[in-house]
Amino acid sequence: MKTGITINGKPVEVPSSFDELTFGQFLRLKESETDAETMCVLTSIELEVCKNIAPELMNVIIAPASDLGEVVYLNKPTVLGKDVPDNLGKMEYARKVNCDNLSRNYKDEEMVCRMVAIYMAEGIDDEDIEATYSLILNESFTNVVSAGKLISEQLKKMAESEAKIPAPQYESAELQAGIKNFSKYGVWGVVRGIALRHGCKMEDVYSWSYNTVLLELKYSAEENSFQRRLNRIMNKPK
């Protein structure tokens, strides 16, 4: 990282690989529009100082960051000194819900970082997640995107498990009455239904493990299918 250059008596260091680049620096680099802004991000030197650096010296300083190479994904990345969870299904359902909602407000690398924050945070409250996100911005870019890759792979498998749950086979009368309109309530409707079944608060359901909620959904689907088959048998014309 050392460039052999000193400014105001301090050695200038510039990341020369993704391992040396923090995630926060990466996000800020994407927004940089001038060489001075790029230098400010890479060196943490004040922007006003960077603006007064001679162009030829500026080029020498930011050159190492022009080719950071390829990202080498780690098999066992660590974030904030902790291993990435290898069984997201055992963690709170709220984390999965929060990840599913990320695409509404974020995209690309920022969405990856927030996804990692959701699963690395100690708690599931927004304050815990935001505090963790702020800390992760100072983590190695390589570690964060590697963690994001592992989490994404698990989330994909979880989504596949949900997709296997059979949809209810509604009767024509139910369809005419507009039963499918209830689907607009999404996760809120699902959690409300589980809470009513167990006589608990919706907040309690969000704190259950994802695996427990998934089992509830599977059970509910099978029970619903059974009740419909039974009703058809019982009401079969004689």
Question: Model-found features: residue ranges?
Answer:
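An amphipathic, hydrophobic-aromatic interaction surface with interspersed Lys/Arg
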Residues: 1-238
